[in-house]
């Protein structure tokens, strides 16, 4: 069991026992509800706090402070980690622990190493996370780069927290947009061979499609000699795959990989839309009107019913989405998480209704929205002068900053907030740069360990160290922060808040730098030096583990 959770479990039991004794003494009616603990923001308020007395106020028909006093009066701390309890504010009970508790974290970190922070909290609940899912009609742009960093990190967070999370990229390689892409590429290929062509309104502009046509002719020099119908049928498969493979290549260079690339075309060719429509009709969840087939989503809170099959017999994108989500559930996933662009916000109601219409709990589908990103350089919004058009791609960004900087900067902010990305700050080699600041803490520790090794000192086994020697305030605060890491993982995973990990890393790096400025790691005091080497090595482990969750490197030299 995680050391902090073990101690919290002991505290909960002690508080529940205190309520039972107060009930036996006639001071309270009882019984004790579930005990919740939180870590106070201000250290002077203790190590943990509980609102137990306020939760019990209604059943006890007493003021929370009176209830809190009864609990404290009957709290037995002997043989526990609880040193003292005091009542604060409207009825909080603040608890201070015996100082020795914090030293228990170092043996745990050393024993678990690269696994420190992992838990079985999620009980292996199966989660399918779909993210990025950019249309295969152009390059990867900034908002998708942000979603890529977030999604890949969230998947790792969920797995660390004990869930079984798999990832997918949904490839929209079917429908009208693919037909238009095929026609655009065909026209551009003719243009490259000297023909004068006009690109109709609604077709795909930009140099990327010209690059696609150029690659086509390099691979198939006699392509234009084929009949138009044959060319277009071929391009409806080839062109989306050209862009999809480009997405895969650039995403992999950015540290984003998927368990599966799921093709919309594969659903259509397998007859999934037709089976879905029949299945919904049999359940009374679909009906025909005006020559079209509609899903009865208003029965589940949508503002209007949604068309599945248009009057011309063409399946809608909504039908494809419904098929895809039904397929996810049919594969046994309990929770679905979709990360979409903010321009899809209007889809929320219909997607939730669709899930209920498919026979699943509304809250089993979670939709997270990615807000827009602006680049800044020299204090001004930065628009790259480039041939593609008015958008900036992930490849453009990675020409300006490192993968580590790009990922870390995207992950520092909550996904649902607009973001201004400072290119100058991301390239700064100083503590003002958040990712440099954290990575430098890791590199500095590696340097300390190398220097100690040169002096004949290795990191000792925790069992051979007197951790009680680590009594300086900076050492105690550093160990407290190390102890919080497993709980931080669980909290961030359950809240889907990846930005909590960069925040934790910044706080941990700050505490390490404060410790380093106050305490000499290697000195003439060998027992103390050994204890401090253990402390800094455990700090290195946690920094590396947290950076790894974010897909950011932990350099040994900088």
From Swiss-Prot:
EC code(s) of this entry: 6.1.1.19
Subcellular location: Cytoplasm
Sorted UniProt keywords: Aminoacyl-tRNA synthetase, ATP-binding, Cytoplasm, Ligase, Nucleotide-binding, Protein biosynthesis
Catalysed transformations (reactions): tRNA(Arg) + L-arginine + ATP = L-arginyl-tRNA(Arg) + AMP + diphosphate
Domain of life assignment: Bacteria
Tagged with keyword Repressor: no
Subunit structure: Monomer.
HAMAP family named in the record: Arg_tRNA_synth
Protein name: Arginine--tRNA ligase
């Amino acid at each position: 069991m995680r050391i902090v959770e073990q101690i919290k479990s002991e505290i909960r039991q002690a508080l529940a026992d205190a309520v039972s004794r107060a009930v036996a003494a006639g001071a309270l009616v009882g019984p004790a509800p579930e005990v919740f603990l939180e870590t106070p923001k201000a250290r002077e308020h203790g190590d943990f706090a509980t609102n137990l007395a306020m939760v019990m106020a209604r059943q006890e028909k007493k003021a929370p402070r009176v209830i809190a006093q009864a609990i404290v009066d009957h709290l037995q701390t002997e043989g526990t980690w609880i040193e003292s309890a005091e009542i604060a504010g409207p009825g909080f009970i603040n608890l201070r622990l015996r100082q020795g508790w914090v030293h228990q974290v170092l043996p745990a970190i050393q024993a678990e190493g690269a696994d420190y922070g992992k838990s079985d909290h999620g009980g292996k609940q199966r989660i399918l996370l779909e993210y990025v899912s950019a249309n295969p009609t152009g390059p990867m742009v900034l908002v998708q780069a942000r979603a890529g960093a977030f999604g890949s990190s969230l998947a790792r967070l969920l797995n660390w927290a004990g869930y079984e999370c798999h990832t997918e990229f949904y490839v929209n390689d079917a429908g009208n947009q693919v037909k238009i892409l095929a026609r655009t590429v065909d026209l551009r290929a003719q243009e490259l061979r000297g023909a004068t062509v006009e690109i109709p309104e609604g077709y795909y502009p930009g140099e990327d499609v010209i690059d696609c046509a150029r690659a086509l002719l390099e691979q198939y020099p006699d392509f234009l000699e084929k009949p138009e119908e044959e060319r277009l049928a071929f391009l409806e498969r080839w062109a989306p795959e050209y862009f999809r493979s480009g997405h895969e290549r650039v995403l992999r260079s950015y540290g984003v990989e998927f368990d599966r690339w799921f093709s919309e075309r594969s659903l259509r060719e397998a007859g999934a839309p037709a089976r879905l429509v029949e299945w919904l009709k049999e359940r009374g969840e679909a009906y025909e009107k005006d020559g079209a087939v509609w899903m009865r989503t208003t029965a589940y809170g949508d503002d209007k019913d949604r068309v599945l099959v248009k009057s011309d017999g063409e399946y809608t994108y909504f039908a494809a989405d419904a098929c895809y989500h039904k397929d996810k559930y049919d594969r046994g996933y309990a929770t679905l998480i979709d990360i979409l662009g903010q321009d899809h916000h209007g889809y929320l109601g219909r997607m939730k209704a669709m899930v209920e219409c498919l026979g699943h709990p509304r809250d089993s589908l979670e939709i997270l929205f990615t807000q827009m990103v602006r680049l800044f350089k020299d204090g001004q919004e930065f628009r790259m002068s480039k041939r593609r058009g008015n958008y900036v791609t992930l490849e453009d960004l990675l020409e300006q900053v490192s993968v580590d900087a790009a990922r870390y900067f995207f992950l520092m902010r909550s996904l649902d907030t607009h973001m201004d990305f400072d290119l100058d700050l991301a390239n700064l080699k100083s503590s003002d740069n958040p990712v440099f600041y954290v990575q430098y803490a890791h590199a500095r520790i590696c340097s300390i360990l190398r220097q100690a090794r040169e002096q004949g000192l290795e990191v000792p086994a925790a069992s051979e160290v007197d951790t009680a020697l680590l009594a300086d305030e900076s050492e105690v605060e550093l160990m407290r922060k190390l102890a919080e890491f497993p709980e931080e993982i669980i909290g961030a995973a359950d809240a889907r808040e990846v930005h909590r990990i960069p925040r934790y890393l910044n706080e941990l790096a700050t505490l390490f730098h404060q410790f380093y400025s106050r305490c000499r790691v290697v000195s003439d005091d060998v027992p103390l030096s050994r204890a401090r080497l253990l402390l800094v090595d455990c700090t290195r482990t946690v920094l590396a583990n947290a950076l790894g969750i974010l897909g950011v490197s932990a350099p040994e030299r900088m």
